[in-house]
Amino acid sequence: VDAAVVELLSSGERFREVVRYLMPGFYLGLVYGFILYLGPSLGFPLIPLPFIDFTRFTSAALPGAVIGVATSLMPWVGGMVVPLGISAVALATSLAVWVFGNCLALTNPALRSLFPEWAAEYYQGMDLTRVLQRSQVRVWLPVQIGAALGFAALVLLKYRRAVAATGRALYLSLKGGGGGSSLPPLRLALACYLASTSASVAVFHYLMPHFPVAVPLVMSLLVGTLMGFASASIVGESGAGFSAPGFLWHTIVYLTPAPNLTPQEAYSVFVYPPVIAGSMTGGGAQTIKAALLTGTKPSDVVKVWVIAFLAGTLVNFLSLDMFWRIAPIPSSAYPSTVVSMPATAMIDALLVTRGLRISPQMLAGSAAVTVALAAAIEALGRLLKVGVSASGLMIGLFSPPITAIPMFAGSALSSLVLRRRFGERWDQAKNVVVAGVLLGEGLAATVAVISLMLLKAVWLWPW
């Protein structure tokens, strides 16, 4: 797909066709984006940002339920490129978890006894942000970790032939000397990988000597390598993305007995892990393949990555300094940080202090249930010959209705209305239309942020 996009944009005639579909979406996103983002910048929001909260209105009938819809166009139009079967499974899972699951964890005596902290912290009238943060930390985080582990195991099992083929190809390449006209020698690449990864483990152990060194060694050299193989193999065979489950390192640390850690080490071991490869391997391999298909040297791609990393790091430092001079982070000056950063801080604090209820039994149970449900969904899809996928199960587990509802609405509009109305023309144009909408809204958001920074620049602190 990436190579096709490059070829498309390189063709003058086809580029004009793309622009014909791109610009209507761009203008729609630009106009809506200005209405959405400039209002808060000027002090009188016309549309609630980032979502419309219905939780307070439904708390009497469904206590603890997370109910709301995003006001950004991103999940709405993004759903247009998601197959209807996947979005339907995602919506059903999201409602089952974040609406009915949250409610039952408060009202059902048996479930209430399993999550006493959630029952103690909830109160009538709690807004959506607090309900989402508290329920994720007190109820769903251990379940999500176990489910991610189970789903990762299922994906590896499903694509075991591709992963095995990758291993055989790597072995044969090493045996034959590796390398090629456009790629560096494989032995050199492997030596660089092992050296840098081992150096990361050595630095980690030097800074945290009281933590068992076997854990970072296994995670970096074994698990990271296997995850990289799996990610590249799965992307190459199916195009589907795959990465290590979230909080994998945190879970391993949580379950590892290390009584001699100092308070500083007890915190640092969670938030400063060694290098664990695999999360970006699939995307990187896909980019290199697209470069080869379009006649681009892979070495040039690596140079661009290095330059972009260095430039991005410099810009990030300068931007962070400027933002902190304008206002504290998090604060009302940066609305999204008020939603996201407290939840992240709570999760870090509860992990470090062992305040979460994470047990091998809970992880194994949620992993087993996830594997069973995913296998049942895949079997049902093959039996009924409908396009449902177990990936929707994971999307719904990690996506509250704020985004799951708009995603399903966009997918239904695309599949049931626009495709029937415009036929193949819509299939050819939808990606470009969606890109145009996101481009327009992104430009409006950028202008709004710049305007907000200029308006608040008078807050600059003297240091």
Task: Describe each region flagged by the PLM.
Residues 1-463:
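Alpha-helical multipass membrane-protein architecture
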